[in-house]
Amino acid sequence: LGEVVMAPEKVVPYFGTVDKPECHLLYNVTTMASTWHTVATKDVSLLRRQLDIISNLPRDYVCQNYLRCHDDIGWGLDYEYLENFGIQEVPHKKYLNDFLTGKYPNSFARGELYNDDPRLGDARLCGTTASLCGIERFGFEGNQEGVDKAVRYDITLHAFMLSQSGIPVIYSGDEIGQVNDYTYKDDPEKAADSRYLHRGNFDWKLAENRHDPATVQGKLFPALDKLEHIRTSHSVFNSNVPFHTIDTWDNSILAFVRENDEEKFIGIYNFSENDKVAWINEEDGMYTDLISGRELEAKGVQIPAFGCYWLCRSKK
């Protein structure tokens, strides 16, 4: 197991070769960071590029996929690619951090900086998935509509992570939507390290709410549990199954296809706060959304704000 913080195409040597493997499993740091970049920018271009690169790696190379972990989020993005869009590294990092710490106007995220270096204009980011998705902000404000949308986004981000090739990992507390733990500031041994913001003890009392559908936990926990069961019951999610991205003709919507001899899967993810249409055009019949059970064609798919679809069609 290894951790390499660099672009996917530069990770390949650390795996060794198929005949002579070195690392058998690597943290998928770049896709994680690119996911949060996409949350802040609402533009999937970079994330799609990451998936395109990974899709061309040998299937023997296995990644450990995650949204959050014990450590901070470092912005090791493909800045050479982003320069094609006029995006420069230092100001872009500042924007990402401003958005995800809630400083940017109308940001729903609540995080904190780690290792802030004003001289270099560089800093890393800390925070739980729930807080970065808006559950903390809207919960504090008593905005139920905002909370519901934030929970939907939390589920969508986990659905995206769970549909990638590799081994998915859900960070402790994310399954019940735990928000940031600011009590670390009261401990002299922890106060200087903002990573403790997302290292709070698992809240077992909060976890009891998972049986109440009116609560955040009662919406989030069953949804993630369902996604996990769907993933384990469909062979199309196996790591050896090839995948490729497809055009949606909307920069805020990501879609990719996984396909084997048994099934064809299309994952669609809306990173926008607005309802959208994914202008895909798969002309091979009806699909079933594995999440809702709804049947629909994979054409001009209407997708709610921060929503997702797991469309699947049996080939038997």
Description of each model-found segment:
Residues L1-K316:
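Active-site and adjacent substrate-binding regions of carbohydrate-active enzymes
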